[in-house]
Amino acid sequence: MTLPGRPTGMARPRGAGPCSPGLERAPRRSVGELRLLFEARCAAVAAAAAAGEPRARGAKRRGGQVPNGLPRAAPAPVIPQLTVTSEEDVTPASPGPPDQEGNWLPAAGSHLQQPRRLSTSSLSSTGSSSLLEDSEDDLLSDSESRSRGNVQLETSEDVGQKSHWQKIRTMVNLPVMSPFRKRYSWVQLAGHTGSFKAAGTSGLILKRSSEPEHYCLVRLMADVLRGCVPAFHGIVERDGESYLQLQDLLDGFDGPCVLDCKMGVRTYLEEELTKARERPKLRKDMYKKMLAVDPEAPTEEEHAQRAVTKPRYMQWREGISSSTTLGFRIEGIKKADGSCSTDFKTTRSREQVTRVFEEFMQGDAEVLRRYLNRLQQIRDTLEISDFFRRHEVIGSSLLFVHDHCHRAGVWLIDFGKTTPLPDGQILDHRRPWEEGNREDGYLLGLDNLIGILASLAER
C-alpha cells in the first residue's frame, strides 16, 4: 500500500545514506522532551493492551481464537524498553574532514549533517575507560562524549508467556546526552586514562590542562598552523580542575579508523636527560616493559636493580622502533570494527612501516590520496610557521583519521612537551640531534612519512 504523500519506489532519496550529509533532520528536542515522548508511548501501549485493541496495521496477527473456540485472553501490558544508541554527532567546531571532492571544510560555523542510523548498542553498554595499555609519554585518551539521538523502543511481552519478542524501533533525529554510554571520541591508542572528559557540546572535547600545552595552543591559534591542529576554545573548569576545550577530531566521521604516529627522533626533552643524571630515578615498571620485549636489553646493573631510568627506557624504546631510523614511529591503530593494536614497538624498517600503513588503509586509493595531499599541506605550512621554527616539538603526534566514505584527515596533536627556544635560536627540524642543539627531527620524520605514502600511491 502506498501511503498518502509518500512517493513510490525507493524510500531514501538518491545518494542518501551515511556518506550523504545533505538530508534534513527532525527538529532538535531536549532530553526532557524525549523522556515525555517515551513515557507517553509507554502509556499508550499499556492502555491499548489493557483495552484489547488490535495491533497496529501491518503488524503480524496471531489467531484470535484458541482451539476450544473461546476468545484468546488479552495479553499482559507491554512496556517498551528505551535504548539510546551512541553514534557520532557531526557538527565540526573548526576545520574538519574534507568533503567528497577533497576540499577541506571551512572553519567554525560549518555543518556536516548526516542521517542517523539505528544501532544495536544499549544503555547498559557502558564500555571501558581505556582501550589499550598506557604509554609512558603520550596523553591521547578516550572520553565520554555527546551521544547521537538514535533511540530504540523495544517492547516485550511478559517473560512468563510463551511468545516471541516484539520490537518496535523508532529513530529520533535529535542529539541527547547519554550519561551511561561512553563514546571513544578521542581514541585511547597510547596514553594516560582520565585526561579527557565530555564537553557537553557537540564537536568539542575536554582535555586536562597543562601549562605548556595551554601556552602552545594559544599561540598556535594565531599561527599559520591553526588549520593543522585541533581548534582551541579556551579553558573551562570541571570538578575543580581546569580543562582545555578542544575540537573533537573524530566528529564528522562515520566509523572512523585512527592511527597515532609519534613524530621526531626522540620523545624526551634534553632537560630530562640532565635531571636523570643529577637525580636518577629508577622505574621498575619500565624495566618490566623492557624485559617483556627483549630480556637481553637491560644491563647487568639494571637486572640487579630490576629497574631502569625513564630516559634510558625511552632511548632504548626509540632505538628498537623507527624513531631513530625514520624520525617517527607508529604508536597504535584503531580499526572501524573497534579492534585496536599497539603492537608496533619493534616496527623499525621502512618496509615494515609501509606494510602497516597499507593494511591500515585497506587499499583505499582515495583515502591514500587525501592523506598524501594533507601531509604535503602540513609540511608546507610547518616550513613557514614562526611557531614551529621557534619551538622544540617533543612527544607530539600526527593523528590519521579516515572512514568508509573516503573522508580522511591528519592533524598535529599533543603539545604538552613542546617548549619555546631561547630568544634568537631557531631549529631546522631536519638536522641530526646532538645533545645541546635541541633538534627534534620532526621534518625528517615527515619527509620519510610522505615518501612512504608516495611509494604506495605509485603501486
UniProtKB/Swiss-Prot annotation:
What family is reported? Belongs to the inositol phosphokinase (IPK) family.
Q: Which GO terms describe its molecular function?
A: ATP binding; calcium/calmodulin-dependent protein kinase activity; calmodulin binding; inositol-1,4,5-trisphosphate 3-kinase activity; small GTPase binding
Q: What is its main location?
A: cytoplasm
Q: Which residues bind substrate?
A: 262, 283, 310-317, 417
Source organism of this protein record: Mus musculus (Mouse)
- Give the protein's function: Catalyzes the phosphorylation of 1D-myo-inositol 1,4,5-trisphosphate (InsP3) into 1D-myo-inositol 1,3,4,5-tetrakisphosphate and participates to the regulation of calcium homeostasis.
Q: Which residue positions does Phosphoserine occur at? A: 135, 195
> Got a GO cellular component term for this one?
dendritic spine
Where are the Omega-N-methylarginine residues found in this chain? 35, 55, 62
Put simply, this protein is called Inositol-trisphosphate 3-kinase A
SUPFAM superfamilies the UniProt entry points to: SAICAR synthase-like (SSF56104)
Q: Which residues bind ATP?
A: 195, 207, 247-249, 260, 334, 414
Give UniProt keywords alphabetically.
Answer: ATP-binding, Calmodulin-binding, Cytoplasm, Cytoskeleton, Kinase, Methylation, Nucleotide-binding, Phosphoprotein, Transferase
| Stretches with biased composition (Low complexity) | 116-132
Its subcellular locations are: Cytoplasm, Cytoskeleton
GO biological process assignments: actin cytoskeleton organization; cellular response to calcium ion; dendritic spine maintenance; inositol metabolic process; inositol phosphate biosynthetic process; modification of postsynaptic actin cytoskeleton; phosphatidylinositol phosphate biosynthetic process; positive regulation of dendritic spine morphogenesis
Could you tell me which Gene3D superfamilies the record lists for this protein? Inositol polyphosphate kinase
Renumbered to this chain, region (Disordered) spans 1-29, 49-164
